[in-house]
């Protein structure tokens, strides 16, 4: 299994450094030479973890469902979709409600798209692409969404993503980029919640080490608020969630 580029600090040391974002920390899955078996195992086991951490049911109810109908299919874009467990979960909610939804999942990592494409369907399509590619193609979507992408980005990349999102959102649509909020409660909570599974359900995957690294790389609400252009807003949610929202129906905090 691949080793981290920077060793994961001990718990007390990590908690002591969370006042500042660690932009030098690197996730194991971002290594082009990462073990492919461990990658697949990670994608396979993301589902149960993401249902708790990323709350796709709440995303569906607040942002997606209001834009769906029975008469025509709405379009949703998932940016940096990874293995595609979250968009497929959202699609299941729409199908349960008898509402029409088509999802395009994009990721620049061929390994992620290869895994996500195993679950392709008429309403779920994964492709290797960036938001800039879709802007160039003239694509638009009713919902443009990402999960746990923001903490991977440099300031310039964040600005480009938000600018592309504004171009990709169709009239009346919404752009939502969700991520973790960095903090001691988030770090300690994930550390403790995943510890009992480190040697069984999560063994051989990158979920636990990369999850902890993600928190160290993530922003606080005030950091994101200072980094976003006019028209975007930061919303806080549970558990330790942040959402950057753009569109005509931004709810008040």
Where in this protein do the model-derived segments appear?
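A short glycine-rich, Lys/Arg-flanked "PGG" loop and its adjoining helix->strand segment in the class I
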Residues: 159-171
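N-terminal, positively charged/glycine-rich alpha-helical extensions of SAM-dependent methyltransferases
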Residues: 1-44
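Class I SAM-dependent methyltransferase Rossmann-like catalytic core
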Residues: 32, 36-62, 67
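C-terminal alpha-helical "lid/dimerization" subdomain adjacent to the S-adenosyl-L-methionine
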Residues: 178-227
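Class I SAM-dependent methyltransferase SAM/SAH-binding core
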Residues: 77, 83-86, 90-133
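Conserved Class I S-adenosyl-L-methionine
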Residues: 217-253
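A conserved beta-strand element that flanks and buttresses the S-adenosyl-L-methionine
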Residues: 145
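Short catalytic micro-motifs in class I SAM-dependent methyltransferases
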Residues: 148-149
């Amino acid at each position: 299994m691949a080793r981290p580029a920077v060793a994961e600090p001990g718990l007390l040391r990590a908690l002591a450094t969370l006042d500042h974002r660690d932009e030098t920390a690197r996730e194991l899955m971002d290594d082009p030479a990462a073990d492919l078996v461990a990658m697949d195992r990670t994608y396979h086991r993301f589902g149960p973890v993401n249902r708790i951490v990323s709350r796709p049911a709440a995303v569906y109810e607040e942002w997606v469902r209001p834009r769906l109908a029975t008469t025509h299919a709405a379009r949703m874009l998932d940016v940096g979709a990874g293995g595609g467990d979250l968009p497929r979960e959202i699609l299941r909610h729409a199908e349960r409600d008898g509402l029409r939804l088509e999802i395009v999942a994009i990721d620049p990592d061929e390994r992620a798209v290869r895994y996500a494409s195993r679950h392709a369907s008429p309403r779920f399509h994964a492709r290797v692409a960036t938001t800039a590619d879709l802007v160039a193609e003239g694509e638009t979507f009713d919902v443009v969404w990402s999960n746990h992408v923001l903490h991977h980005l440099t300031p310039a990349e964040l600005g480009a993503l938000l600018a592309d999102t504004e171009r990709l959102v169709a009239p009346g649509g919404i752009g939502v980029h969700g991520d973790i909020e960095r903090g001691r409660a988030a770090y300690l909570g994930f550390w403790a919640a995943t510890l009992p599974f480190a040697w069984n359900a999560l063994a051989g995957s990158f979920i636990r080490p990369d999850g902890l690294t993600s928190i160290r790389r993530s922003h606080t609400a005030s950091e994101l608020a200072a980094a976003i252009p006019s028209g975007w807003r930061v919303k806080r949610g549970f558990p330790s969630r942040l959402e950057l929202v753009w569109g005509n129906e931004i709810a008040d905090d």
